[in-house]
């Protein structure tokens, strides 16, 4: 399956001009007999170097080809359509201003708190476990939550596991986090998690992180491995811990406005292509992880990969976080992702 995904990506690289058009967008459907294509807006939170783009480009190219050009899709990276406001882009999707949308579950949880469930600390310990859960009951639960939030889930991919870097110490135990000033996502669960581990979590724009680390205003930060490398964070830190503490899925969705305008045949096509697109995206994400992990040797960086026993100590330390959010997430939903109280 991986070889197939890589082959698809190579083909996509050769098909750069797939989303040209720049029509009005946002007005899906239209007269089936019209020769003028309907241009749909697809918003992502990432630049075109990300694995998310591989999925977006696959979807755009396939839909245009299989509808004989009735639909063209323009991809907008870095949340251009919402002025960089990631939560705002979800709201624009709900309003039907954005037609198609890729965003991680972490940000979706600002709209529907239950969508934070798969991102909880040390919940799914391996990609094998992730695939079993996300291709099964966990993934179906997420799709239903998106549908209840004013959108239609077309597929689920991944940003991957989040790691941690800092300039103070090698992190091998919960005690090593004490007092560290760390940039974390501005999501309540993440802030509370790092406070519970004794750190000093702060929220700031990602664009400020590099300089803050360089100048000592921050001790460290966390992110997926590919972003820590591609955003050059590894240039200004001394220590990295690979601990796979939080898995972050990517949700690919359509607005209800677009969905209601499609024929039954088009809905089937969009669903099937969306699922395929996120398979391509996920394979690209895992290849990017392997490539970035190999690249760590190029940096003046001490890399610590935690053992199962070391991770067990962290799992024990974060149990209060699960208790804190038991009512918000629900015991049944936590169970879908492998956690029982």
What are these regions (language model features)?
Residues 16-20:
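C-terminal motif of bacterial Sec signal peptides marking the signal peptidase cleavage site
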Residues 125-145:
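A gly/proline- and charged-residue-enriched helix-loop-helix capping module
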Residues 22-127, 147-341:
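N-terminal secretory/targeting leader peptides
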Residues 1-5, 9-10:
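Positively charged n-region of N-terminal signal peptides that target proteins for export
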């Amino acid at each position: 399956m991986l070889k197939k995904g890589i082959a698809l990506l190579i083909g996509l690289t050769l098909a750069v001009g797939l989303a040209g058009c720049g029509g009005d967008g946002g007005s899906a459907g239209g007269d089936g007999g019209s020769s003028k294509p309907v241009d749909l807006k697809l918003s992502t939170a990432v630049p075109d170097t990300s694995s998310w783009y591989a999925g977006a480009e696959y979807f755009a190219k396939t839909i245009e080809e299989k509808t004989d050009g009735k639909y063209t899709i323009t991809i907008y990276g870095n949340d251009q359509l919402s002025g960089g406001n990631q939560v705002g882009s979800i709201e624009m999707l709900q309003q039907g201003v954005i037609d198609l949308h890729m965003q991680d579950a972490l940000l979706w949880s600002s709209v529907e708190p239950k969508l934070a469930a798969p991102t909880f600390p040390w919940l799914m310990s391996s990609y094998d476990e992730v695939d079993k859960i996300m291709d099964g009951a966990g993934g179906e639960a997420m799709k239903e939550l998106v549908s209840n939030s004013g959108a239609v889930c077309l597929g689920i991919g991944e940003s991957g596991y989040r790691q941690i870097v800092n300039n103070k110490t090698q992190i091998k135990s919960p005690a090593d986090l004490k007092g560290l000033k760390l940039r974390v996502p501005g999501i309540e669960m993440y802030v509370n998690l790092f406070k519970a581990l004794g750190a000093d979590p702060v929220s700031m724009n990602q664009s400020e992180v590099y300089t803050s680390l360089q100048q000592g205003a921050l001790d460290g930060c966390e992110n997926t491995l590919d972003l820590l490398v591609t955003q050059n964070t590894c240039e200004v830190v001394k220590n990295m811990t690979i601990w796979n503490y939080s898995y972050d899925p990517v949700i690919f969705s359509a607005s209800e406005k677009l969905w209601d305008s499609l024929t039954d045949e088009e809905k089937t096509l969009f669903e099937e292509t969306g699922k395929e697109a996120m398979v391509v995206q996920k394979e690209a994400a895992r290849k990017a992880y392997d490539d970035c992990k190999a690249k760590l040797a190029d940096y003046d960086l001490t890399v610590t990969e935690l053992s199962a026993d070391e991770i067990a100590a962290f799992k024990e330390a974060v149990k209060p976080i699960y208790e804190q959010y038991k009512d918000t997430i629900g015991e049944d939903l936590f169970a879908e992702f492998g956690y029982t109280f």
